[in-house]
């Protein structure tokens, strides 16, 4: 089985046959949320991920295209590559396990979030301690920015879990065929 990384341009100019190639690229360019699309020969999906270095800024975009014997990641923002690097055992999986590999990568994205969320929890505790003593004058603005950042993260986690559930459901259907 082949796992590869491409840029959007490399994917578009690839000589290989990829059903729904143009729809995939259009979905990537207009990414509004995390989603996955299934078709008879495979599936593709888009991940719109909040940038933890700047939660108020632009989203990071990654995508995957899966067909029998092949997974292609479009990952110019370098979101998927580190997850796959940590899971080197996934590179030796046989053909027919494409969706299992994809699920492992998506679950890896969630696992990598746990330490980050623990740091946020610590910051919240620090803020609570400060607020008990003396609330700062700009507290409403700070709270609003923080709430917006948490809303972005929450939206991503909900969408990612929806994508994972959809893939698991589709995997179950394919196994029962």
What does each model-found stretch correspond to?
Residues 93-109, 113, 175-177:
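Long, non-coiled-coil amphipathic alpha-helical linker/lever segments
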Residues 106-120, 124-127, 143-146, 150-153, ...:
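Amphipathic alpha-helical coiled-coil segments
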Residues 108, 112, 134, 170:
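Residue-level signal for short amphipathic helical patches enriched in basic/charged
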Residues 129, 133-139:
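Long, hydrophobic alpha-helical segments that serve as membrane-spanning/inserting helices
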Residues 137-177:
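Membrane-associated alpha-helical segments
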